[in-house]
Curated annotation (Swiss-Prot):
UniProt feature, compositional bias: Polar residues: 22-35
Biased composition (Basic and acidic residues): 427-443, 460-474
Residue stretches of biased makeup (Low complexity): 1-16, 448-458
UniProt similarity note: Belongs to the translokin family.
Gene Ontology molecular function, alphabetical: fibroblast growth factor binding; gamma-tubulin binding; microtubule binding; protein homodimerization activity
Protein name: Centrosomal protein of 57 kDa
UniProt subunit comment: Homodimer and homooligomer. Interacts with FGF2 and RAP80. Does not interact with FGF1 or FGF2 isoform 24 kDa. Interacts with microtubules.
Segments of this protein annotated with the region centrosome localization domain (CLD): 58-239
InterPro entries: Centrosomal_MT-associated (IPR051756), Cep57_CLD (IPR025913), Cep57_MT-bd_dom (IPR024957)
Gene that encodes it: Cep57
Region (Disordered) residue spans: 1-41, 255-275, 424-476
Length: 499
């Protein structure tokens, strides 16, 4: 009875030990024929009562967020600790079971004789315990393998995370580099567009400037031709003035002697004198009156350049400058002798006034050209300030230097013309003073009728020597030479202009 009670107690203890792991494992061992069941999806751990909602399943891979990864690592560490604790508990339970089995075997050995019938049942129970032990060992091995696999997965996830971060950094750098490259290309494109617009504006301005310069050159060519025509007219006018002045001097001397003779002679001679010279026909032009055209000269020769075609044109068109003084004035010689002073002033004054007008026109044209050059100087300075490239700036500075040199030459020409104008005015005032002196001497000779003819001849000779027509002609020729050199300089400067 005692043995039966001991066996019953041991059986109940063994059944309680077997029942505890069956509860802790969550009904994993259900029956000997089907010892395994499906793992519950809402229970992530084996030996814990932690539950998870079925709508939020568990994933083996970590999330992309670092916090989620760290939380997963913590959970894994907790799981590992729990598994270690469970493994220790399982080993302890196995040890206790082994001790119990040893004790049970001892009890069985002692009670072999008594419990021969229960031998098969005990062997069955032993086999079941052995199978349970093998299953527990297999589960432990499987858990160890899962733990190692999870460690490898964590390492692989860390490596993938670092590689992804490196790729993101490299992609960000490439994107920034591409953006900077595109920005630089856009800035270069903007600069090229601005340069193209500037070049088109400069080209349009240059074309406009070229058109203006072509029109200016055309106008200056016409002005040069006009100046040549004026210079030729001025040359012919000066020579005609010289001839008229010489003729006037000779006529003054002859009329002074004739007047004294008339006072001594009879009055009918005056009537015959009017009949001979009252109505003068048109003066037939003789080439002897134009020494610079025909090649002969009554005075010392001068290297005077003359436009023969212009002179022939004046001859064909009845130029009053080349006609005789009596025909030009259309007054008889008797009336001319009575009014010497007034007629001499009128005969000398128009050529000098025409010369002054020509010089003033030349001076005006030179001043206009100088003003245009100053305007071009301002335009060039503006272009130099606005020029984008250094090469264009250097070219414009060279043009500006050439323009400054031309302006200096033009200023010298203006000073020369003003000097010539002042010289001509001085000569005209000197001529007027000499004519006034001649008039006074002729009036004194007319009033002093008691003087002899010898005295009149000597006074007339003295007056003739005082006037010195040869020197005046030389001065006029010198002035003509200066005008021609000025004309040549104007032509050369007009031809050499380049912008």
């Amino acid at each position: 009875m005692a043995a039966a009670s001991v066996s019953a107690a041991s059986d109940s203890q063994f059944s309680s030990v077997l029942a505890e792991p069956s509860r802790s494992n969550g009904n994993m061992v259900h029956h000997s024929s089907s010892p395994y069941v499906l793992y519950p999806p809402d229970k992530p751990f084996l030996n814990s009562d932690l539950r998870r909602s079925p709508n939020k399943p568990t994933f083996a891979y970590p999330e992309s967020n670092s916090r989620a990864i760290f939380s997963a690592l913590k959970n894994l560490q907790d799981k590992i600790r729990r598994l270690e604790l469970e493994r220790i508990r399982a080993e302890e339970s196995v040890k206790t079971l082994s001790r119990e089995t040893i004790e049970y075997k001892k009890v069985l050995d002692e009670q072999i004789q008594e419990r021969e019938n229960s031998k098969n049942e005990e062997s069955k129970h032993n086999q079941e315990l052995a199978s349970q032990l093998v299953a527990a060992e297999n589960k432990c091995n499987l858990l160890e393998k899962q733990l190692e696999y999870m460690r490898n997965m964590i390492k692989h996830a860390e490596m993938e995370r670092t590689s992804v971060l490196e790729k993101q950094v490299s992609l960000e750098r490439e994107r920034q580099h591409d953006q900077s490259h595109v920005q630089s290309q856009l800035e270069k494109l903007d600069l090229l567009e601005q340069e193209y617009n500037r070049l088109t504006a400069m080209q349009a301005l240059a074309e406009k400037k070229m058109q203006e310069l072509e029109s200016k050159l055309h106008e200056e060519e016409q002005e040069r031709k006009r100046m040549q025509a004026r210079a030729a007219e001025l040359q012919s006018g000066i020579e005609a003035n010289r001839l008229i002045f010489e003729d006037r001097n000779t006529s003054c001397v002859s009329t002074s002697t004739r007047k004294i003779k008339k006072k001594k002679s009879k009055p009918p001679e005056k009537k015959g004198f009017r009949n001979n010279f009252g109505a003068q026909p048109h003066y037939r032009l003789c080439l002897g009156d134009m020494p610079f055209v025909a090649g002969t000269s009554t005075s010392p020769s001068h290297a005077v350049v003359a436009n023969v075609q212009h002179v022939l044109h004046l001859m064909k068109h009845h130029s009053r400058a080349l006609c005789n003084d009596r025909v030009v004035n259309s007054v008889p010689l008797a009336k001319q002798a009575c009014s010497r002073g007034s007629k001499s002033k009128k005969s000398v004054a128009p050529p000098s006034s025409s010369v002054n007008e020509e010089l003033s026109d030349v001076l005006q044209t030179l001043q206009d050209e100088f003003g245009q050059m100053s305007f071009d100087h301002q335009q060039l300075t503006k272009l130099i300030q606005e020029s984008p490239s250094e090469e264009l700036k250097d070219n414009l500075e060279c043009e500006l230097e050439a323009l400054v040199r031309r302006m200096e030459a033009k200023a010298n020409q203006i000073t020369k013309v003003r000097k010539y104008q002042a010289q001509l005015e001085k000569q005209s005032t000197d001529k007027q003073k000499e004519l006034k002196g001649n008039k006074k001497t002729l009036d004194e000779e007319g009033n002093s009728s008691s003087r002899s003819s010898v005295i009149t001849r000597t006074t007339s000779k003295k007056d003739f020597t005082k006037q010195r027509p040869g020197e005046k002609s030389r001065k006029n020729l010198q002035l003509l030479k200066d005008m021609q050199t000025l004309q040549n300089s104007l032509q050369s400067s007009n031809v050499c202009w380049d912008y």
